């Protein structure tokens, strides 16, 4: 009721699955995950094994700190933070207190050993982003594609007047135009799957200085690489205090492209509905306008378009900002990173609205036929191309004089063809051609749809 952001208010139910990745509580949980797994990896090193060993019970207790992380745990950390005024330090204190409760005070010195807060934060953010992408965002995008493919398959053989520059152009099919967006999104999904998110775990200024001072014989760079790999990330080998953020920026740019494609799709669907190419379902009880009772507005495509714009503004800003920091580090990037989930939420909301929009439309075959019947001029391209094939160097200009800016009816088209100086074979082909059949190799193009 009193939320400032519509994501946490009006749209909360639509994006709640992202809370496990981008809420502050989720961030705390991922920080604990990184701290705990780092502690467990340290204990495996020979330098530490002589002094400490872990039972299965201890292992389970430690991992349960993030597996079973609760509202109560989160509130406890926030209470600690209210005193320390440092969120990562509050996590360290929380873990230390838990170790004391299970009688493993000997492990407390290893919590956050040799690390800076950024080691924990950058790794946590990469894990959050990777998890949200794999488990929420990509499946949501695929769900849009699933419904869009169904619609494209149903309409792939429905001839439609295409418009270039808003003017009648070569015949296409409704399904083929939808398939354009499917093809573009499928390509982006391949690319997004190839992006490896990076993390650094090399201390205050990226040199393992504290680690090396404590245990000079250990190969800390190799240790960090193995640890980061174990978490499912790639090592960023040469850094300052911060991980530069280039890999997350790369991922966000992928989302920008995906969202631009979906925005383009939303705009086209809006225009097709406006042209009466698609008609929308009349859902009983719904209201389209507060003053015009007759209206059924394309609200789902409009909502998607608006939220895609919000998402992309967020993604573009983040992708630019998170890759910059003063010298070895400043804190301005920290508050920026806290907004990482905003673009994901607005994107997810858009994807769900696109599905709703697609499910509510059906093709208007009468309108499709009407537009083609009224635009025989689109066959002018075929006529001039046939004449060119026959060697007529003035073919284009001849047909231009006969058709440009003129209403071409079926009768006039047939007259133009009959008056051509062309072979009987070519004339017969053109006489059989109609705006409904001028489809080129669309069947072949769509055979794998």
Feature-to-residue mapping (PLM):
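Glycine-rich cofactor/substrate-binding loops
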Residues: 1-30, 34, 57, 80-85, ...
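Glycine-rich anion/phosphate-binding loop at the beta-strand->alpha-helix junction
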Residues: 188, 234, 240-326
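A structural signal for small-residue-enriched, beta-sheet-centric alpha/beta enzyme cores
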Residues: 117, 212-215, 230, 235-242, ...
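Conserved catalytic cysteine-centered active-site region
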Residues: 98-104, 224, 228-245
């Amino acid at each position: 009721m009193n939320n400032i952001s519509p994501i946490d208010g009006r749209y909360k139910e639509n994006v709640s699955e992202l809370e496990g990745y981008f809420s502050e509580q989720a961030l705390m949980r991922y920080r604990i995950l990184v701290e705990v797994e780092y502690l467990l990896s340290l204990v495996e090193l020979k330098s530490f094994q002589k002094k400490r060993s872990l039972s299965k019970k201890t292992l389970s207790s430690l991992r349960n700190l993030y597996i079973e992380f609760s509202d109560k745990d989160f509130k406890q950390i926030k209470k600690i933070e209210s005193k320390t005024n440092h969120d990562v330090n509050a996590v360290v204190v929380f873990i230390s207190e838990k170790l004391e409760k299970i009688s493993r005070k000997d492990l407390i010195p290893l919590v956050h050993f040799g690390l800076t807060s950024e080691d924990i934060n950058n790794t946590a953010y990469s894990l959050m982003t990777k998890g949200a992408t794999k488990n929420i965002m990509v499946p949501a995008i695929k769900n849009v594609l699933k419904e869009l493919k169904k619609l494209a398959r149903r309409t792939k053989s429905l001839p439609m007047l295409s418009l270039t520059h808003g003017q009648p152009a070569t015949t296409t099919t409704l399904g083929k135009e939808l398939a354009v967006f499917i093809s573009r999104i499928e390509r982006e999904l391949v690319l997004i799957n190839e992006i490896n998110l990076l993390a650094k775990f090399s201390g205050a200024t990226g040199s393992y200085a504290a680690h090396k001072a404590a245990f000079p014989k250990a190969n800390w760079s190799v240790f960090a690489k193995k640890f980061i790999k174990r978490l499912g990330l790639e090592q960023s080998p040469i850094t300052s205090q911060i991980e530069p953020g280039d890999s997350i920026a790369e991922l966000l740019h992928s989302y920008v492209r995906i969202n631009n494609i979906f925005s383009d799709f939303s705009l086209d669907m809006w225009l097709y509905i406006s042209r009466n190419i698609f008609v929308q379902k009349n859902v009983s009880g719904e209201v389209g306008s507060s003053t015009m009772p007759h209206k059924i507005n394309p609200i789902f495509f409009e909502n998607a378009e608006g939220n895609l714009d919000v998402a992309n503004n967020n993604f573009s800003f983040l992708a630019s900002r998170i890759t910059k920091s003063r010298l070895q580090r400043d804190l301005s990037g920290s508050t920026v990173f806290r907004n990482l989930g905003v673009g994901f939420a607005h994107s997810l909301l858009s994807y769900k609205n696109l599905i709703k929009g697609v499910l509510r439309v059906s093709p208007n075959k009468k309108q499709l036929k009407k537009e083609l019947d009224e635009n025989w001029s689109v066959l002018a391209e075929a006529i001039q191309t046939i004449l060119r094939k026959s060697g007529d160097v003035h073919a284009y200009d001849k047909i231009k004089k006969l058709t440009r800016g003129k209403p071409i009816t079926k009768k006039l088209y047939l007259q133009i063809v009959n008056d051509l100086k062309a072979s009987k074979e070519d004339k017969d082909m053109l006489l059989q051609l109609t705006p409904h059949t001028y489809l080129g190799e669309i069947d072949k193009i769509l055979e794998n749809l």
